[in-house]
Amino acid sequence: MIIHPNFDPVAIHLGPLAVRWYGLMYLVGFILAIVVGRLRLKLPHVAAQGWSAKDIDDMMFYGVLGVVLGGRLGYVLFYKAGYYFSHPLDIFRVWEGGMSFHGGFLGVTLAMALFAWQRKRHWLEVTDFVAPMVPTGLAAGRLGNFINGELWGRVTSPDAPWAMLFPGASRDDAAWLAAHQDIAAKWNLNEVFLSHQMLPRHPSQLYEIALEGIALFFVLWFFSRKPRPMGAISALFLIGYGAARFTVEFAREPDDFLGLLTFGLSMGQWLSLPMIVAGVLMMIWAYRRGGVAKQA
């Protein structure tokens, strides 16, 4: 078993200002997205569409607004609506955590629609350009989750070489142990808990980095290196992210205030299913429609 390093959540102290790892990872994610976007400008079929470095910079402004506003509102509405309706001022306490990818996705989608309208481009032309830029940002965000020791995975066997002990999960571990003595006996978890006051869990944040970040990036990068029908790259992102998130959720601990929902699926899985369906339908539409994005 591996013990999580339990990093200090504050990366840098600048006088009275504390720069947290999670916020720093958001910054890294946006920088990586810009780098990927500029690399895409070197592709002949992308350059022929008239994209420029200034377009990328402007996109990032819209993207940051979409991620922050959409991510926060998505968390409020999808995960803890009852609490925030009773404590509306807490919605603005973003530094305490609480962001939703699916909310951020909707926020960025709306932001890119506004960008497309202002630039007189088709909305899907914009999202096709942006889609390969997203996974590196997702990977950075999940790395922030891992550094913070949050959003850990479900309990697993201590014999698994990747099993990890998360100090922040100790309270949840005690409750889990009391409710699952059958599994605890099978995996000798009572002995593990007595020794460490923690239970071995999946490092699901690392799984998400591997699937939603690295794997999805390479899939989208190589797929988008050739001209594709408008909407196809966006569709592949929807399918790829939805499938990756749906899969990882089987190893990720459900939110304690929600638990598992209908059919034993988590909220993250239920929110990912529409993405997969929409992606498949969009891919079919894109290839039936044919053609590629117009050239400048």
From Swiss-Prot:
First-tier enzyme category under EC: transferase
Gene Ontology CC: plasma membrane
Entry's Gene Ontology BP terms: lipoprotein biosynthetic process
One Pfam family from the record: LGT
Keywords, ordered alphabetically: Cell inner membrane, Cell membrane, Membrane, Transferase, Transmembrane, Transmembrane helix
Transmembrane parts of this sequence: 17-37, 59-79, 97-117, 230-250, 265-285
Superkingdom as given in the UniProt entry: Bacteria
Alphabetized GO MF terms: phosphatidylglycerol-prolipoprotein diacylglyceryl transferase activity
Keyword Cell inner membrane: yes
Location(s) in or outside the cell: Cell inner membrane
Acetylation as UniProt keyword: no
Enzyme Commission designation: 2.5.1.145
Bilayer disposition of the protein: Multi-pass membrane protein
Residues that bind a 1,2-diacyl-sn-glycero-3-phospho-(1'-sn-glycerol): R142
Pathway: Protein modification; lipoprotein biosynthesis (diacylglyceryl transfer)
Stored NCBIfam families: lgt (TIGR00544)
General function of this protein: Catalyzes the transfer of the diacylglyceryl group from phosphatidylglycerol to the sulfhydryl group of the N-terminal cysteine of a prolipoprotein, the first step in the formation of mature lipoproteins.
HAMAP family cross-referenced by the UniProt entry: Lgt (MF_01147)
Family as reported in the entry's similarity comment: Belongs to the Lgt family.
The protein's name in its UniProt record: Phosphatidylglycerol--prolipoprotein diacylglyceryl transferase
The organism of origin for this protein: Burkholderia mallei (strain ATCC 23344)
